[in-house]
């Protein structure tokens, strides 16, 4: 749990720092530096011999997370023709969905059969492959919209980016208020066995992949705002259905799939909305979105846990989850 917290702290700390002090470099060089930090962080974690090294490894690994997706979205907005940017960002975000579907089960297998060190060593090696791909295939472009340090904050005078930050935070909090307790929810309320959880996690991982792809497809027909609002509505309804029909296995699986699909269907449209409403401070805006996303995860898990602390059964975590998602909508 502490290692997860160190990673999350790295995300929150690193995103704005990288956004503010990277305007003098090209976007390609920023991406290369961020991936190098990933390699270093995972290498430190892999070969650590003390708790301090473990903590430093996770902190360094989390540091580039938020900025990487922010810079990546800006690069795509500059090289993809208008009207296709949301779909392109959805393609970038699909990396996270594939990680949930394939990477986590495979990493768990390596940890159980060999050692957790092999999992993080593989991640470091994969980061090197990403580094190579960026070096050869990403064009060397600059974000000419970046002004002085003070000018990068000007977009925050408008309420629009704050509303998008709030929507990102509450939307993620809503899903994670329930998803953080998916195992006991499925086992103790829906009646699944512990051995079924691998299948269930792969199913919701597939939902994340398909939700992200669907969002990208719809971006050619609808605005990012409309996609985000409708997706939040679908998440609210699916969370309410999870509360009322949690005792039925088929219903639980169906609405869990829909809920997780909705979570990643939100990612690309919200990222594009931030870029559209953060003129002059796109890097800072995108980084702020990642902070809101991670803060939402923590708030959601706390809200779900509060219901359990008050003595309610596991399916009651879906109620604050639905309320948080409704706030996002």
Question: Locations of the language-model features?
Answer:
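Conserved MFS/SLC helix-loop-helix module at the cytosolic interface between two early adjacent transmembrane helices
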Residues: 13-49
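Helix-breaking motifs and short loop linkers at transmembrane-helix boundaries and internal kinks
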Residues: 26, 47-53, 191, 245-246
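Helix-loop-helix hairpin linking two adjacent transmembrane segments in secondary transporters
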Residues: 53, 82-83, 87-136, 181, ...
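C-terminal transmembrane helical hairpin of 12-TM major facilitator-type secondary transporters
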Residues: 225-270
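Helix-to-loop junctions at the C-terminal end of transmembrane segments
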Residues: 15-26, 211-224, 308-309
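Paired small-residue
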Residues: 41, 52-61, 250-258
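A late C-terminal transmembrane helix in Major Facilitator Superfamily
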Residues: 277-313, 321
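Cytoplasmic helix-loop-helix junction between adjacent transmembrane helices
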Residues: 57-95
């Amino acid at each position: 749990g502490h290692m997860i917290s160190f990673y999350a702290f790295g995300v929150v700390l690193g995103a704005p720092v990288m956004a503010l002090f990277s305007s003098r470099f090209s976007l390609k060089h920023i991406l290369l530096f961020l991936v190098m930090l990933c390699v270093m962080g995972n290498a430190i974690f892999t070969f650590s011999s003390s708790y301090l090294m473990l903590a430093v490894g996770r902190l360094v690994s989390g540091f580039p997370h938020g900025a990487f997706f922010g810079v990546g979205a800006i690069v795509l907005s500059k090289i993809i023709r208008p009207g296709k940017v949301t779909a392109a960002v959805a393609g970038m975000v699909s990396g996270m969905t594939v990680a949930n579907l394939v990477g986590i089960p495979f990493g768990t297998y390596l940890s159980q059969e060999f050692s957790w060190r092999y999992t993080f060593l593989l991640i470091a090696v994969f980061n090197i492959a990403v580094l190579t791909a960026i070096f050869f295939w990403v064009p060397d472009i600059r974000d000419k919209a970046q002004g002085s340090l003070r000018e990068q904050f000007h977009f925050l005078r408008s309420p629009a980016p704050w509303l998008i930050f709030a929507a990102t935070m509450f939307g993620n909090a809503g899903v994670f208020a329930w998803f953080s307790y998916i195992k006991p929810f499925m086992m103790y309320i829906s009646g699944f066995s512990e051995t079924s959880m691998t299948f269930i996690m792969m199913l919701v991982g597939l939902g994340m992949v398909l939700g992200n792809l669907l969002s990208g497809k719809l971006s050619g027909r609808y605005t990012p705002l409309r996609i985000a609002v409708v997706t939040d509505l679908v998440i609210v309804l699916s969370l309410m259905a999870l509360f009322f029909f949690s005792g039925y296995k088929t219903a639980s699986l169906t609405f869990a799939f829909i809920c997780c699909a909705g979570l990643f269907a939100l990612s690309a449209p919200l990222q594009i909305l931030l870029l559209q409403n953060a003129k002059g401070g796109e890097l800072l805006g995108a980084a702020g979105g990642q902070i809101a996303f991670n803060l939402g995860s923590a708030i959601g898990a706390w809200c779900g846990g509060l219901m359990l602390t008050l003595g309610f059964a596991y399916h009651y975590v879906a109620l604050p989850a639905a309320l948080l998602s409704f706030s996002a909508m």
